[in-house]
Regions:
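Alpha-helical transmembrane segments and their immediate juxtamembrane cytosolic regions
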Residues: 1-287
Length: 287
């Protein structure tokens, strides 16, 4: 084990660690209602998304077929978002207490792939294409606001408003409306890619930005609440724990690793719905 750490961790090893932490996090997420799952599962799980993000940054940078890479991420993200949309609007397949999964990290990664390609085009001095790619992601929510303002009658037509809602939550999501991740996750992803090649600078800047967004800003809002005590930043508002993923990122040795290529794509949706289904059965059994 010490020898492996000395030699660093390859991409497969980092993903495996992230996968294990993600499972702990989602066990807490889906079975928290039992009161039997320790919060530490969720705390450890805060490191999972940043690690997967880092691995996706490296994967996108090194893949030989970016279009296929993007389509795979887009396809999985769109399918999961479509099912989530169905649960929200049709109120189908919900757990007895009304709970349904809001796991949409692939949509964040899909949007980031577009931004990363834009960053590369800017590096290649293809300024028009680069700016257009990044602007498409950033401006899409505002385009939709302008569109709905120009045609307010759409919101009065149930079928039309449903179609629009589906489009902007599933195949063409707004970065402001994704139910998993946050704007700090997207900003962090853009920074990780833009600063690739300078590992210490990359991770220092990323960690500072995440700490500012998820600790400092959160603390500023939380401290206005009556009864808030600073220790709640370690027991309730612990999203910022993800910053410690930088320590594992530092161990990355630049190697892709062997095996499990497809596992990391399909394990995410598979384990989400298996755990969700199990939680539904367990909830019904406890009633």
């Amino acid at each position: 084990m010490l020898t492996k750490l000395k030699n660093g961790l390859d991409g497969t090893q980092l993903k495996t660690i992230a996968l294990a932490l993600m499972v702990l996090d989602h066990i807490h997420y889906f079975f928290e209602f039992t009161g039997c799952i320790p919060t530490v599962f969720s705390m450890l799980g805060r490191l999972s998304a940043p690690l997967f993000l880092f691995c996706t940054v490296e994967g996108f940078a090194h893949t030989h077929d970016r279009r296929r890479y993007f389509i795979r991420i887009w396809g999985i993200g769109t399918a999961m978002a479509a099912l989530e949309f169905f649960m929200i609007y049709a109120k189908a397949f919900r757990r007895g207490d009304g709970f349904y999964p809001l796991n949409a990290i692939f949509q964040d990664l899909m949007l980031l792939c577009i931004v990363w390609q834009g960053i590369d085009w800017l590096r290649e001095k293809k300024f028009a294409k680069g700016i257009a790619a990044i602007a498409a992601v950033l401006c899409w929510p505002f385009v939709m606001v302008a569109f709905l303002s120009a045609f307010p009658q759409i919101q009065q037509m149930p079928w039309a408003s449903t179609v629009v809602a589906f489009v902007i939550t599933s195949p063409l999501p707004l970065w402001t409306g994704i139910t998993d991740g946050s704007w700090s996750f997207l900003l962090g992803g853009a920074l990780l890619y833009a600063l690739r090649g300078r590992r210490k600078v990359q991770l220092t800047v990323w960690a500072l930005v995440i700490f500012l967004c998820d600790f400092v800003l959160t603390f500023g809002m939380a401290c206005r609440q009556e009864g808030f005590v600073w220790t709640q930043m370690f027991t309730t508002y612990y999203e910022w724990f993800g910053v410690f993923a930088a320590l594992l990122m530092l161990l990355y040795n630049g190697q892709r690793g062997k095996g499990h290529k497809q596992l990391f794509y399909w394990f995410y949706p598979a384990h989400v719905y298996l755990l969700y289904g199990a939680s539904c059965l367990f909830y019904n059994a406890l009633r």
